[in-house]
């Protein structure tokens, strides 16, 4: 489809892609870039299954060499949306201060408070949080574009949101980013790797927080947005 082609060409950075360039490593990086852009697993699967169909057709026409299990390492199935919203009881637990104990680390506390900030910013996705720029903040208003859709959004910060933002904002004067999540130039492979590592660590810390709080559902970076959408409407 046209959307699949556009996604591939955007990732490739050119208007050409040869079949011999499609390797398990290339596919894994393509899958990762789609997730970094905010695509759901089902969207990722749609793109990869479309590409696989084109590849298989090319093999049949002897336009491409057959590579066994080429798509084995990437996701080509379908899954139900598991981004469950927290109920009010669990959200109260998340907003409550974690009691001091040996089980709580600074990383867990930071993840909990960033999660609260994302919720207060109308369910801001982690990918948008990571790529926010200092220039996006003017006074108590953040204006930015969703990386997934390109849609422009503005959010007015509450007192609590401003407190958390000022607590965790980037102190490095030379950095254009509002938060110290990324350090490399936007769009570079290194920035993508930094984002992936930060997201993985954020979700790991949130999972620990969720277990410590005894939440009924798994706490993850998606939960803030899904919960905000549920409570807002």
Predicted regions and their residues:
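Active-site/catalytic core of tyrosine-dependent DNA strand-transfer enzymes
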Residues: 91-92, 158-216
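Short, basic (Lys/Arg/His-rich) helix/loop patches that form interaction surfaces
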Residues: 101-106, 203-233
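Conserved tyrosine-mediated DNA breakage-rejoining catalytic core shared by Y-recombinases
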Residues: 72-73, 131-170
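Short, contiguous acidic/charged loop-to-helix segments that flank catalytic cores in large enzymes
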Residues: 101-105, 143-156, 189-198, 216-223
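N-terminal core-binding DNA-recognition domain of tyrosine recombinases/integrases
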Residues: 5-82, 97-101
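Short, basic/aromatic-rich helical patch in the C-terminal catalytic core of site-specific tyrosine
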Residues: 27, 51, 117, 129, ...
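Basic, Lys/Arg- and aromatic-enriched nucleic-acid-binding interface segment
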Residues: 45, 66-126, 130
